[in-house]
A protein has these predicted regions:
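Short, flexible/disordered intra-domain loops and linkers
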Residues: 15-20, 47-59
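Short "lid" loop at the C-terminus of a central beta-strand within the Rossmann-like core
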Residues: 44-46, 171-172
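Acidic beta-strand-to-loop metal/phosphate-binding motif
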Residues: 38-42
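Phosphate-coordination/substrate-recognition cap region in phosphate-metabolizing enzymes
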Residues: 61, 65-68
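Active-site regions of metal-assisted phosphoester/phosphodiester hydrolases
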Residues: 1-37, 68-261
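Short active-site-adjacent helix-start/loop capping segments
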Residues: 46-49, 82-84
């Protein structure tokens, strides 16, 4: 069975410079992605300041995003503050059997989590494990968080079970990438994708394998956002760029078509 995946750091649903709400633009953008499963980072499920500016509404930010065609969702709170909270989320067209959020914060200045959910591509199909994460800004924090993920995969997920690990890894030095590949046996979706853009091919020597540049969205240079797989095959992957996407977030979304089995 083929699935389309996407990962996207949505910058809390506001523009990077002026803090203008972009939820409805993001909803339309998610609809255009046409992904079966979307991994989101920096999702504000509650924001009283934004609610006051936008007027009375019964819909939470996650309600708005889910209305782009996703009947199933999971949300994990990472950071709580007086006017709201934010975290990671998974939107899915496939029913989510269960989910749990795991705190992987490394210090008091950053609240980080790994959201784990389980879906099945079809009745009777093996469980497909989804992990959505947003790693820390400090290298040592990221390395410890990668170690936590590696341990979780070893302890909690059967060796033959298919896994998708996606999110914003903040790994501009690529240490996390090397560890996840070496310890967990994961592959990144761009490993098997041939570069069509000559500039991308020219710069590929600066990054391990085929990691794609996603940040900043206005002129992507750093390879922060990724989709790692185990037990799935990649049929295509791309970064969506351009002015319209740059207006939605400071990250560019990453999309991959994969096959289970």
């Amino acid at each position: 069975m083929r699935l389309r995946l996407a990962t996207y750091n949505i910058h809390k649903g506001v523009t990077a410079l002026r803090g203008r709400p972009r939820l409805h633009e993001l909803r339309l953008a998610l609809h255009r992605l046409d992904a079966d499963i979307v991994f989101l980072q920096e999702v504000q499920e509650r924001n009283e300041r934004l609610a006051r500016r936008s007027g009375p509404t019964r819909s939470s930010p996650l309600d708005v995003l889910s209305s782009s065609g996703y009947a199933h969702r999971a949300y994990g709170v990472n950071a709580i503050y007086p006017h709201g909270h934010h975290g990671n989320a998974i939107l899915s067209r496939l029913p989510i059997e269960h989910h749990a959020n795991h705190d992987v914060s490394d210090h008091m200045l950053e609240n980080r989590g790994v959201l784990h959910a389980v879906v099945r591509a079809a009745p009777g199909a093996p469980p497909l494990h989804l992990l959505c994460t947003h790693f820390g800004l400090a290298r040592r924090s990221r390395e410890r968080q990668a170690g936590w993920v590696a341990g979780f995969l070893e302890r909690e997920i059967p060796a033959g079970a298919p896994v998708i690990l996606a999110g914003d890894f903040n790994d501009w030095q690529h240490a996390v990438d090397r560890r996840l590949r070496r310890v967990s046996g994961l592959r990144e979706v761009f490993d098997e994708v041939e570069r069509q853009d000559w500039f991308e091919r020219f710069l590929a020597w600066r990054r391990p394998r085929g990691l794609a540049r996603t940040f900043p969205s206005i002129a992507p240079w750093l390879s922060l956002d990724r989709i790692y797989l185990r037990g799935l095959r990649t049929h295509g992957a791309r970064v969506l760029g351009g002015a319209a996407w740059a207006r939605c977030s400071d990250h560019s979304p990453l999309v991959a078509d994969v096959e289970l089995g």
